[in-house]
Amino acid sequence: MQRVNMIMAESPGLITICLLGYLLSAECTVFLDHENANKILNRPKRYNSGKLEEFVQGNLERECMEEKCSFEEAREVFENTERTTEFWKQYVDGDQCESNPCLNGGSCKDDINSYECWCPFGFEGKNCELDVTCNIKNGRCEQFCKNSADNKVVCSCTEGYRLAENQKSCEPAVPFPCGRVSVSQTSKLTRAETVFPDVDYVNSTEAETILDNITQSTQSFNDFTRVVGGEDAKPGQFPWQVVLNGKVDAFCGGSIVNEKWIVTAAHCVETGVKITVVAGEHNIEETEHTEQKRNVIRIIPHHNYNAAINKYNHDIALLELDEPLVLNSYVTPICIADKEYTNIFLKFGSGYVSGWGRVFHKGRSALVLQYLRVPLVDRATCLRSTKFTIYNNMFCAGFHEGGRDSCQGDSGGPHVTEVEGTSFLTGIISWGEECAMKGKYGIYTKVSRYVNWIKEKTKLT
């Protein structure tokens, strides 16, 4: 034993070699072989497995989906700052455009905790909710729209109204504003409101030439003092309507412009014939205590009207009353817009006519005020429907199939267009061939041609 100890002390290297040989010859039971080890760690190889990531292109799944990435790591994937920024906006807080917040056709661009709407022409605001041009839906104005110097929408209202708090709607500024039905039992019968379409306001006024200088022999019209197929109006439903009495009662109609003036057809009036105007009328054979009678003290036909040349060209006249009318729910003026808007309103496509005229061709006159909704007829169809001249200051309205029309005794009465609950004068009943005849239409004086003249002559002093 002493000898062994001496050998170990003198030859430590020998001992180490012996131990190493023993270990190498022993069977290893701690580690699995290569094949079995792979069965336990069965993990798919990654895209760049075996390579240094710093030297390969980034992978979106590896960089940002398996674990949260930084902007720089995302930049490695896209290799483009702009594309990385677009991805980053949604990656950080989701897609803010998912709810489609942009209105009126706006395009949404996502941002971090926010979004941006790219608005089409005519709109602005956070969600493109603000109209900035009158060309689109009248700028959301209830009545009139004008573009300011910086191309912003400025709404306005006709006389007797003021802008509401929203700067879009119009509200009454006087007790009985024009064009409004205020009798409670008839307010439910107000005709369907007309909503502004998209309009090209630059070209809204037709490029028409008034044929002022045409000389033409007097034409022989049949029954051209021209509501057939209409309905009984309720008291106060058309408070701007008046009836004219002269040699015979209810020979023509008219509309209240203001307390002192009536507008009617020029062919209705004769110099030297006494005319009485009755406002607030409903049943011409009954006294309903809503009527107001006034005498006409002055007749002003349009300066281009000449019955000797043509009885229905420039067929418009103004009547001055001896005493002002007292405005109330049964006696209310009709609204008159400017030339541009009167023309736009007419193009809405349908209007209402009213009167006490004959209820059928050569038949009896109506006792109760009649009204009828009539569609506008395109000019080409209008011209083809008659052998008589249709001037540019006239328009056609009615039904091709016949059966409904204005008729004798309705002449001078109103053709009105309702705009968001307020009625505007767009025409004056003038003439036609018979009444409600198939293929024939009622012919009306186009008020847009005469609004400046009306307003100039009827100013209240």
Swiss-Prot record:
Q: Provide the binding site for Mg(2+) 3.
A: 82, 86
Residues reported to bind Mg(2+) 1: 61, 66
Q: Which Cys-Cys disulphide bridges does the record give?
A: 64-69, 97-108, 102-117, 119-128, 134-145, 141-155, 157-170, 178-335, 252-268, 382-396, 407-435
Could you say what the effect of mutating residue 328 to Y is?
In HEMB; moderate; decreased protein abundance; decreased function in blood coagulation
The reported result of mutating residue 227 to D is: In HEMB; mild
Note the effect listed for residue 160 to E: In HEMB; mild
Q: Supply the name of the protein.
A: Coagulation factor IX
State the species of origin. Answer: Homo sapiens (Human)
